[in-house]
């Protein structure tokens, strides 16, 4: 076991604080509309230029083990804020640095770290209550666009594209971001349900120009097992042929003889058919097949439910207006499903999202929900160079998360003013003792720092700007750093999602509280590796050979 280096109390806290400061100072220059860029060197390819706080935080690794502990804990703040709200990472980092600095000063002055933490937690709860009370719901796509514009550092096109996408697929819909080939921003909207399985054989193609299968008014057979021969399916296939309508088969897999028979029938023109594999794996596959069944008013043919293939009738098959299949995706448009049944299924998935503890499961459930409730929109981000495209894609991702957060919990005035005015909610709040009251004061001071930093990045004195606003006392008034004007920020469109501000503060206080109450730090000592012995010249063992 390797030897350990242990640091205690003041020595440990000072080294950790140094690491916190290094990371926070690199991240906070990106805050606000006039925040600066950070250039990140890459081991391969061109350097990356970004204004995204979490991207900067993730790249920082320090040589000193103890300083690195502080930096990594602060990186955790940025990552947590990013995971929960998708934005507010720089705000969270600035808040955490302010809380850690003041907290460590107080601990050095002899205050009880645990009481300081209790005071901090008390103040954070009060500020969160105040933010929720002042939050207003998002109304209309213009406010959604505005949230996107602010989060994308003033890029109007980004905000408008996100608002347009949300309008088309609904607030529950899936919106994905991809890199485009050209210079322009593009928005593609897929109606209906899409899943990532393509046709099993190119012989099913009906439109050779576009290399896709198009089925109009098809029946849809949803089968949860593999199909290796079609003997048991003959009755239903004959019924479909007589109806004159096409058939889509969705099954776990369609192998050998079964696939060959379908292809031959398709080529002879007797049966208009296409086959795809079922989406997902395991239990998730069953759930997704059930979703498709509800969407198309069909039944999932499952032997577990006592339904055999030979007993299937036409009214057990799903129906849709149109199905399009390319080599990678299948899209079912306008399924014949009952609106009430679909609504019930949506509620059921929502309940599962609430109770699940796994981020992966939650993401997959949200995808299923979106496919049932709305549709899928793809925003394609263009640019002149690869570096520009990547930087813009980062901003679009941030803006997308921010707009979702705004729809979820509403909005507050932006530019750091919501937290600045929350200091009023802390007036008169006292802890059980002086140390707890000091913890409350730490938060009162810390929640001014985002506004001060935004003003400083715009070339103003942060303390003067904060003082001016607190003197005016109108909670709608703020400092618009983009135009250097004091004005009503909501009216000017400078707004932040309440969820982003709330999670930034809660995550910052959580990690800062842990750092303040740290009394020892343990790290591995580097091993002294012995120097490699000097090799003798030539090839060993070849001496004495006379050529």
Swiss-Prot record:
Major enzyme class: isomerase
Start-end of Gly residues biased regions: 535-547
InterPro entries: Chaperonin_Cpn60_CS, Cpn60/GroEL, Cpn60/GroEL/TCP-1, GroEL-like_apical_dom_sf, GROEL-like_equatorial_sf, TCP-1-like_intermed_sf
GO terms of biological process kind: protein refolding
Keywords (A to Z) from UniProt: ATP-binding, Chaperone, Cytoplasm, Isomerase, Nucleotide-binding
Residues that coordinate or bind ATP: 30-33, 51, 87-91, 415, 480-482, 496
Presence of keyword Chaperone: yes
EC number, UniProt record: 5.6.1.7
Region (Disordered): 527-547
One Gene Ontology molecular-function label: isomerase activity
Catalytic reaction equation(s): ATP + H2O + a folded polypeptide = ADP + phosphate + an unfolded polypeptide
Domain of life of the native organism: Bacteria
UniProt cross-references to PROSITE patterns, sorted A to Z: CHAPERONINS_CPN60
Cysteines engaged in disulfide bonds, as pairs: none
Signal peptide positions (record): none
GO cellular component, one term: cytoplasm
SUPFAM superfamilies linked to this entry: GroEL apical domain-like, GroEL equatorial domain-like, GroEL-intermediate domain like
Keyword ATP-binding found: yes
Subcellular location: Cytoplasm
PANTHER family for the chain: 60 KDA HEAT SHOCK PROTEIN, MITOCHONDRIAL (PTHR45633)
Family membership noted in the UniProt record: Belongs to the chaperonin (HSP60) family.
Known function: Together with its co-chaperonin GroES, plays an essential role in assisting protein folding. The GroEL-GroES system forms a nano-cage that allows encapsulation of the non-native substrate proteins and provides a physical environment optimized to promote and accelerate protein folding.
Assembly and binders: Forms a cylinder of 14 subunits composed of two heptameric rings stacked back-to-back. Interacts with the co-chaperonin GroES.
Official protein name in the record: Chaperonin GroEL 1
Organism expressing this protein natively: Sphingopyxis alaskensis (strain DSM 13593 / LMG 18877 / RB2256)
